[in-house]
């Protein structure tokens, strides 16, 4: 899908967990969005002190309403300022960007395991919706730091079985998503995952020979492959071989890039 740029209007902004916000934008640009796993590059406002856009993954798309939903963590100056924006405000958006999850890898009737960690959870929701529509059976394992950080448990339950893990044990299973997968003996035909690098490393080590795809979280400058700020090296490749996470990714087959 060719990238576009335009202005979208904030129609909803809600804190859904500690420092995590659900942002719903509306406008014609949404008609160009369809692939799960892509992201939008959002300019927070027109001030000169925040020139760089913020990459935010797409959590859901409603083409009929021309609305796109994103969930982001207000951790830095830019995202905190975005969290303060009110309904009715217009924001400048570039996107959709990147290569998303390959839906065609999961065939009708196959078992799919979605594994998300923290702010890596949102893009898996729209992916799960599309997979269920295509006839796949979806199980989700979602990891968070603590109960205060948990979001979207109920929406994921509408897709299939859901397992929640918290690092401090305050909600769901104590520990990490990999612990839950082992304890519940969860198996799959295809795995899709997005989350922090340590989680992706653990999944890569375990499922290198399986049908599995990971989405990398990375700071980005331009979002279109021009600045080389989000380069990662190719597994077993030559020294000069690399991938740009913003354009070649953020989704890669497991084992393709060095984490």
Swiss-Prot record:
Biological pathway: Pyrimidine metabolism; UMP biosynthesis via de novo pathway; orotate from (S)-dihydroorotate (NAD(+) route): step 1/1
Any one GO MF annotation of this record: electron transfer activity
Domain of life the protein comes from: Bacteria
NCBIfam families per record: PRK00054.1-2, PRK00054.1-4
One biological process term in Gene Ontology: 'de novo' UMP biosynthetic process
Cofactor(s) named in the record: [2Fe-2S] cluster; FAD
Pfam families reported for this sequence: DHODB_Fe-S_bind (PF10418), FAD_binding_6 (PF00970), NAD_binding_1 (PF00175)
Residues reported to bind [2Fe-2S] cluster: 222, 227, 230, 246
Entry-linked HAMAP family: DHODB_Fe_S_bind
Job of this protein: Responsible for channeling the electrons from the oxidation of dihydroorotate from the FMN redox center in the PyrD type B subunit to the ultimate electron acceptor NAD(+).
Family statement drawn from the similarity comment of this UniProt entry: Belongs to the PyrK family.
Self-association and partners: Heterotetramer of 2 PyrK and 2 PyrD type B subunits.
Name the record gives this protein: Dihydroorotate dehydrogenase B (NAD(+)), electron transfer subunit
Xref: InterPro entries: Cbr1-like_FAD-bd_dom, Cyt_c3_hydrogenase_gsu, Dihydroorotate_DH_ele_sf, Dihydroorotate_DH_Fe-S-bd, Dihydroorotate_DHASE_ETsu, FAD-bd_FR_type, FNR_nucleotide-bd, OxRdtase_FAD/NAD-bd
Keyword set, alphabetical order: 2Fe-2S, Electron transport, FAD, Flavoprotein, Iron, Iron-sulfur, Metal-binding, Pyrimidine biosynthesis, Transport
Cofactor note: Binds 1 [2Fe-2S] cluster per subunit.
Residues of the FAD-binding FR-type domain: 3-103
Record: residues binding FAD: 54-57, 71-73, 78-79
SUPFAM superfamilies associated with the record: Ferredoxin reductase-like, C-terminal NADP-linked domain, Riboflavin synthase domain-like
């Amino acid at each position: 899908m060719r990238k576009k740029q335009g202005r979208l209007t904030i129609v909803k902004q809600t804190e859904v967990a500690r420092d995590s916000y659900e942002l719903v934008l509306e406008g014609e640009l949404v008609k160009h969005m369809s692939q799960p796993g892509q992201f939008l590059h959002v300019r927070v406002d027109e001030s000169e002190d925040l020139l760089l856009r913020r990459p935010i993954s797409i959590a859901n798309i409603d083409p009929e309403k021309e609305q796109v939903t994103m969930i982001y963590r207000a951790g830095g100056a830019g995202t905190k300022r975005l969290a303060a924006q009110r309904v009715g405000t217009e924001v400048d958006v570039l996107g959709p960007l990147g290569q998303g999850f390959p839906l065609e890898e999961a065939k009708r009737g196959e078992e799919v395991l979605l594994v998300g960690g923290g702010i890596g959870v949102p893009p898996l929701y729209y992916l799960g919706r599309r997979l269920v529509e295509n006839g796949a059976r979806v199980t989700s394992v979602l990891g968070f730091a603590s109960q205060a950080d948990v979001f979207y448990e109920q929406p994921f339950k509408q897709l299939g079985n859901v397992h929640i893990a918290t690092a401090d044990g305050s909600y769901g299973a104590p520990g990490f998503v990999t612990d839950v997968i082992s304890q519940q003996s969860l198996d799959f035909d295809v795995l899709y995952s997005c989350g922090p690098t340590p989680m992706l490393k653990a999944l890569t080590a375990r499922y290198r020979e399986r049908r599995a795809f990971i989405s990398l979280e990375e700071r980005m400058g331009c979002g279109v492959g021009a600045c080389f700020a989000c380069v990662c090296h190719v597994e077993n490749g030559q020294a000069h071989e690399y991938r740009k996470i913003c354009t070649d990714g953020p989704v890669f087959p497991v084992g393709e890039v060095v984490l």
